[in-house]
């Protein structure tokens, strides 16, 4: 019997996938680094105070232990987990430094299966969870793969309304008089590209999300490369699409077109082929609160960014997503972050609003064969909720320390709209979202959270129920 058990264990190990790669993505300032830090912290503290009642393997005491193990890919930087914890437990506590490139951390989860057949032959199994972080700015380059240079130029210049028009004034000034068919002036093109980059930085600084090309604001090792020295043609119709499309590659317009092609083919497609093809599960983090606070332009910009992003995901079998990635990702979770920054009675509205934002992707998920869910969470809970009395009436409120100066606050931020806000919402805006510092926390206790265990159950719960199938 012992020999039979040993042979069956070997057979099970050979015939199953013991690895799961999780992609953590999100739009700018959505809390990606905090999410990974908190997720790892909860799992590592599974026997020392972690609160994970919604993770079935933890609730049923089948998750026996978790430890960090070396990465398989030595070329990817290590996720800065320890540095992030040091910031969170510091005096004063601070949020972890946001990610600026690809990073990874790998965990080994030892668990006992609840599979009634295999558990008689295999007492325990190990799941290797690889968590990959990369900037949301890079994710938003994906729609560029479905556009040529001129269609992209039309889209980018079409966005130059309102504040975007103000921030792009210098770029438009430098573009004036640029002859598309003249021999390429690399120095001038570099100056105009720098002005476009400054415009993108202004958009990011003011809380906008639809920023292309994403590498311009987070260039990494590509800083200064000619591949990052292009920009949209300022007025396609004034010159004529046919004339621009046929411009010699050594002309101003031709060089911009060729650099755009290179960026899409070598930078964007290369990045996704290298990393995205290998992902099994994905979580997309979305901060709906800051755009609500910033006004209709910021909110509509976030909506546009999500729409563009999700159009890249729910293409059919013969289209871009299938050709590039194949149906590898089988679970996709959308999470409305910072649930601790609104009162408990508004959590359901947060989720409803996010569902409205991604409804097209939701409708197509079943056809694509991708399991999707949507929830609200706080990776690291920064506030305490309770009731305060106002004019003899008790209302829900939050208590925390303001991020900017650390001053204690007790506030009711207001109501989160359950549906996409219309003009009436913006005219009578009563929503006042505050950014909070992390709470002062004991080093020997896991980080506090809201529904992080629900996210874990969706993303890895099924893998912890079976013996590495």
Predicted regions and their residues:
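GTPase G-domain guanine-specificity segment
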Residues: 341-366
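Short, conserved secondary-structure transition motifs
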Residues: 330, 335-342, 375-386
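Post-Walker A alpha-helix
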Residues: 35-36
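Switch- and interface-adjacent substructures of P-loop NTPase systems
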Residues: 7-11, 16, 42-328, 343, ...
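Hydrophobic anchor at the beta1->P-loop junction of P-loop NTPases
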Residues: 22-24
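P-loop (Walker A) phosphate-binding loop of NTP-binding proteins
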Residues: 27
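Short secondary-structure boundary/capping segments
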Residues: 39-45, 144-149, 299, 348-354, ...
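Conserved glycine(s) of the Walker
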Residues: 30-32
């Amino acid at each position: 019997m012992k020999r039979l058990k040993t042979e069956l264990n070997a057979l099970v190990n050979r015939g199953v996938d013991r690895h799961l790669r999780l992609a953590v993505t999100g739009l700018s300032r959505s809390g990606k680094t905090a999410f990974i830090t908190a997720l790892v912290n909860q799992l590592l503290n599974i026997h020392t105070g972690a609160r994970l009642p919604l993770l079935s393997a933890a609730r049923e005491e089948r998750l026996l232990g978790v430890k960090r193990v070396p990465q398989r890919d030595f070329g990817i930087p290590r996720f800065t987990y320890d540095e992030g914890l040091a910031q969170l437990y510091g005096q004063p506590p601070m949020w972890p430094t946001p990610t600026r490139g690809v990073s990874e951390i790998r965990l080994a989860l030892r668990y006992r299966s609840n599979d009634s057949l295999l558990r008689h032959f295999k007492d325990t199994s190990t799941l290797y969870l690889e968590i990959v972080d990369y900037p949301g700015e890079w994710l938003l380059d994906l729609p560029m793969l479905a556009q040529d240079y001129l269609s992209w130029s039309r889209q980018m210049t079409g966005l130059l309304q309102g504040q975007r028009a103000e921030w792009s004034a210098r770029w438009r000034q430098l573009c004036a008089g640029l002859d598309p068919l003249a021999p390429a002036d690399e120095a001038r093109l570099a100056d105009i590209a720098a002005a476009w980059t400054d415009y993108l930085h202004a958009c990011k600084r003011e809380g906008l999300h639809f920023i292309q090309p994403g590498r311009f604001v987070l260039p990494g090792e590509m800083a200064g490369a000619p591949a990052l020295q292009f920009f949209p043609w300022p007025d396609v119709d004034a010159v004529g699409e046919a004339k621009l499309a046929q411009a010699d590659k050594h002309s101003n317009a031709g060089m911009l077109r060729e650099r755009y092609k290179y960026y899409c083919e070598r930078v964007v497609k290369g990045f996704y082929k290298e990393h995205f093809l290998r992902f099994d599960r994905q979580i997309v983090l979305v901060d709906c609160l800051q755009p609500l606070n910033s006004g209709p332009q910021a909110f509509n910009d976030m909506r546009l960014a999500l729409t563009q992003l999700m159009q890249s995901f729910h293409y059919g079998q013969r289209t871009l997503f299938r050709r590039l990635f194949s149906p590898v990702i089988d679970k996709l979770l959308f999470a409305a972050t910072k649930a601790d920054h609104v009162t408990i009675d508004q959590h359901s509205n947060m989720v409803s609003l996010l569902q409205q934002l991604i409804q097209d992707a939701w409708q197509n998920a079943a056809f694509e064969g991708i399991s999707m869910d949507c929830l609200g969470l706080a990776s690291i809970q920064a506030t305490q909720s309770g009731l305060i009395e106002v004019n003899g009436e008790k209302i829900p409120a939050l208590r925390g320390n303001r991020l900017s100066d650390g001053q204690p606050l007790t506030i009711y931020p207001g109501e989160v709209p359950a549906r996409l806000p219309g003009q009436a919402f913006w005219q009578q805006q009563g929503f006042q979202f505050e950014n909070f510092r992390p709470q002062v926390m004991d080093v020997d206790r896991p980080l506090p959270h809201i529904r992080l265990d629900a996210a874990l159950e969706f993303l890895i719960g099924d893998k912890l129920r079976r013996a590495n199938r």
